[in-house]
Regions:
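Conserved S-adenosyl-L-methionine
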Residues: 2-109, 117, 128-130, 145, 187-196, ...
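Conserved ATPase-coupling elements of RecA-like P-loop NTPase cores
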Residues: 119-124
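Glycine-rich S-adenosyl-L-methionine
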Residues: 130-154
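Short, flexible active-site loops
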Residues: 131-134, 160-167, 193
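Short glycine-dipeptide loop
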Residues: 154-160
Length: 196
């Protein structure tokens, strides 16, 4: 699956001089590594690829950083965070002046394989810019919360690939409203169903 996702993203980004890639549920970093390898075939300078990773579990967060460096990626091209993606969005700010230097992270490609149908706390998230436009995923299933987080962090010409359970295509309620809104706003290009 990661090879297919990587090739689709690399094809979309092939003419860009500088590329930012983000995995908000990076695990060991394998998706970032595969995408970076595919994108590197199309760029003149591999050092123009910047990798952003966020991971909840500290041990796998450390694996992400280690695996990227072991693949020859310069530490200066790796920005990794140990945090909860749905609770702690990734703004950029300078530590000594967070209020005046705040800006959200926008990237050329987002790739993720978030935990399936995980419960999440949507309390006080109605005005969160990641969800305000399309709605809140149900508290019992965070699949669309992850998807909307990913979508929010894309540049206007960016591309996203996310692995989700088939249920996101058929479930009703708030998920149906989010799905309909995404389709009506032309935010879904392709869905690839794979056997279990």
């Amino acid at each position: 699956v990661s090879v297919l996702m990587s090739e689709i993203i690399a094809h979309h980004l092939k003419d860009q001089a500088e590329i930012k890639i983000y995995d908000p549920t990076s695990g060991s970093g394998s998706l970032l590594i595969n995408i970076g390898t595919s994108v590197a075939k199309h760029v003149k300078d591999n050092n123009k690829i910047k990798y952003y990773a966020q991971e909840l579990k500290e041990n796998t967060y450390n694996l992400t950083r280690m695996n990227l460096v072991m693949r020859g990626i310069l530490p200066s091209n790796i920005v990794a965070r140990n945090a909860d993606t749905l609770e702690d969005d990734w703004p950029y700010f300078e530590e000594n002046d967070p209020i005046n230097t705040y800006e959200p992270l926008y990237v050329d490609a987002v790739v993720s394989n978030p935990p399936y149908s995980q419960a999440w706390d949507s309390k006080n998230k109605e005005s969160d810019p990641r969800y305000a436009r399309f709605g809140l995923a149900p508290t019992t299933k965070a699949d669309y919360a992850f998807l909307l987080h990913d979508l929010y962090h894309l540049t206007p010409d960016g591309i996203m690939a996310i692995v989700l359970p088939h249920g996101v295509l058929f479930r009703g309620g708030e998920e149906e409203r989010i799905r309909k809104n995404l389709i009506e706003n032309n935010h879904i290009d392709t869905i690839i169903g794979l056997p279990a």
